[in-house]
Amino acid sequence: MVFLSRNPRAMTAFFEIINGNMKPDAGTFNWGVTITTAYLPLDNTDFFNTDLNLVDWLSQFGEGNEVYMKGFLGRMLFSGEEVLKKVSVLSGGEKMRCMIARMQLRNANCLILDTPTNHLDLESIQAFNNNLKTYRGNILFSSHDHEFIQTVANRIIELTPNGIIDKMMEYDEYITSDHIKELRAKMYGDK
């Protein structure tokens, strides 16, 4: 399911709260006992303050030998000598690909993705989409990428200043529906 809002900071705060990194202003939130989560945060800067190579960096976040780690990196288009590159010199897109490999390593049944296609090139987005198509768990995400939303989401939840809009439908239908347009205008207080 995709979460939408005109306020991107609200989306990030929401994901930080449900991931346990931030306390809500009011109320509580708890996952069910069978839920295991993997979070892909919007800001990944703190994860890359090291001189480790990609394989050693990824090994910090899960168990497995070098070949196992290279397999996860390979799914995100790192191959050959690239896996020995220092993480401190990675581009924004390469860092995001590493974070996706890290998230996949957790083998969670619920993925939380805060604008996951930021910094990714088309080839990386396609590889990520293909991985998500075969994923058997729940995916909660926000994105500005129309194609990504259309491909991954089957439920739309929009957070507005006056409540939520929650619809089981494809994104293209959501953005073209006259009923939804009227509802959004009302919920945002548009004239």
Regions found by a protein language model. Name each.
Residues 1-191:
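ABC ATP-binding cassette signature C-motif
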